[in-house]
Amino acid sequence: MHVHPISTFRVFQEGHLLRNSIAIFALTTLFYFIGAELRLVHELSLFWPLNGVMAGVFARYVWLNRLHYYAISYVAMLVYDAITTEWGLVSLAINFSNMMFIVTVALLVVRDKRLGKNKYEPVSALRLFNYCLIAALLCAIVGAIGSVSIDSLDFWPLLADWFSEQFSTGVLIVPCMLTLAIPGVLPRFKAEQMMPAIALIVSVIASVVIGGAGSLAFPLPALIWCAVRYTPQVTCLLTFVTGAVEIVLVANSVIDISVGSPFSIPQMFSARLGIATMAICPIMVSFSVAAINSLMKQVALRADFDFLTQVYSRSGLYEALKSPSLKQTQHLTVMLLDIDYFKSINDNYGHECGDKVLSVFARHIQKIVGDKGLVARMGGEEFAVAVPSVNPVDGLLMAEKIRKGVELQPFTWQQKTLYLTVSIGVGSGRASYRTLTDDFNKLMVEADTCLYRSKKDGRNRTSTMRYGEEVV
């Protein structure tokens, strides 16, 4: 996958009152305009994105949850209505109902954040579903009461229409707003990575062609596929687009769910609730996959890295040897390092000092080796370094560089300065990527033999074996 860097821009910034106020006013006006343009049948909008968007904004940026910011959003709604409608005082009640949804969802999500609840838990999606349900009901009660005088419908049909619209748009938009992020780089997808999205488009087309109430569920398998393959951000965005498109297509009878009978509000009520219920499924799956992936990374991190020294563990080293970056390996040098007289450090200064020595030692070795090799703790005070190279001499030079670097590096413990030394055994030979693990194991045996020779001959030395002879 190729990536292209893109610049990032933040609309809201903490502590910038004027900037945030202008942004809230502009955003409210923009999405009020979009919703007003979708008033196709009655005075009520077919699809009202404003409340979901603003609820997501206030929920996402905790520091925006201030009375004056909410007031600015409310005033923006009133100003728009004053310019474009003749609702008069009725506008106060209708827009207050909008604020009911925004404030309810925002405060409930902010409460979850303060309680430290994970945003990528499956239960998080279910909580959002419930929050939108509660907020939509409160919004619908106030809105239906306020809009009776400007709409030809009675209270109960208005309540059903208002509730279903707020609930469906909330479930579609709020998760999208909470997860939306501008990536630092723009990925270029491969053809096979686009298959779930293509399947989603085909399923929506099938809904149009086949029709019927059941056709609204056609995109669900494709959305589940997207949830498994894509990130929660992409999944929520695709779910929102799919749900919004279906609602618009149903309202315009492009997707015919009326089965020969005249289209009515109860059918729109059912369609919206069905789409909202369907939408939460891929979001829950996506959050589940994200949680599992996060857990797997933590497990892999614990298995592949030594907790104390933060270098590879034994198993992690073997996994690293499988990396495609080592495909050009022609020669491999394996070093076994043993800190000299480490037991006396534990005996004289305590195990806490010993742990600190191991940590500092590993960090120093990692700094010397850099990206030229792999460093791992094999157990106790014994470490291994694997250096893939083209020239056999490179590994031996690296071993001596490590030995001298350790010898010259002072270690301070409780105002006492200690100097460490290390004995190194080196195994060196030809290697290829296909057999790299086997080659490593063979050279480990050779390095272990040479390490024994280094310790036997007085420690603080590097030993290697060439052509059957031992060279120090």
Curated annotation (Swiss-Prot):
The chain crosses the membrane at residues 21-41, 44-64, 90-110, 128-148, 167-187, 198-218, 237-257, 273-293. InterPro entries: Diguanylate_Cyclase, GGDEF_dom, Nucleotide_cyclase, Rev_trsase/Diguanyl_cyclase. Mg(2+) binds at D338, I339, E381. GO terms for molecular function: diguanylate cyclase activity; GTP binding; metal ion binding. Binds 1 Mg(2+) ion per monomer. Its EC number is 2.7.7.65. CDD domains: GGDEF (cd01949). Its main location: membrane. It catalyses: 2 GTP = 3',3'-c-di-GMP + 2 diphosphate. Substrate binds at N346, H351, D355. It is found in: Cell membrane. GO terms for biological process: cell adhesion involved in single-species biofilm formation; negative regulation of bacterial-type flagellum-dependent cell motility. GO terms for cellular component: plasma membrane. It is a multi-pass membrane protein. The keyword Protein transport does not apply. Its cofactor is Mg(2+). Pathway: Purine metabolism; 3',5'-cyclic di-GMP biosynthesis. Catalyzes the synthesis of cyclic-di-GMP (c-di-GMP) via the condensation of 2 GTP molecules. Homodimer. This is Probable diguanylate cyclase DgcF. It comes from Escherichia coli O157:H7. The gene is dgcF.
